[in-house]
Amino acid sequence: MATPSDSSPTAPPGGGAVAPGQLIGERYRLEQCLSSDPQAPQGRLWRAADTLAGGAPAALRQLGPAVDPEAAGRRWAKLQGLLHPQVPRFGAAIAEGSDLWLVREWQDGRTYRELLEARAARQLVFGGGEVLLMLRQLLPVLVVLHGQDLVHGDLCPANLLRRERDGLPVLLD
């Protein structure tokens, strides 16, 4: 999610050598790299365990040295102020080595891309009613974002998660 006035170029991904088991910010133990494309411009996404919260899961985004840390920090601070039940809470921004790590609340569920692929494998699609319901559930989230002068910039099935506990769409990345 970015501000409309954010004109920084797409930054290369995080490049620091890290591996599962590594501790980030003396708190988050990396468990699994979830990025399907490690060269993605938004960096690498990791599932981690918060060692100060009994191993609770967290999502960490690893941004490399090509990212402007001041601009990313300003954007992250704005996101930390966002409070909506369909937007994961945004935690710390951790500078470690040449990388910037952005922490957010973990959400259990499947992305709409995964749901589409699973249905396509069975030669099924989402019905019109399902799509309309999802859009009605998502529009209030976008209203909150836009009210804070934030835009998502990449609203697609891969960035929408159907939350396991209540079935609501959750806006990611």
Task: Set out the residue ranges of the language-model regions.
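Activation-segment/catalytic-loop signature of the eukaryotic protein kinase fold
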Residues: 93
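Flexible N-lobe loop architecture of eukaryotic-like protein kinase catalytic domains
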Residues: 83-87
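AlphaC helix of the protein kinase catalytic domain
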Residues: 112-125
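Conserved short submotifs of the Hanks-type protein kinase catalytic core
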Residues: 97-111
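Catalytic-loop of the protein kinase fold
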Residues: 142, 146-163
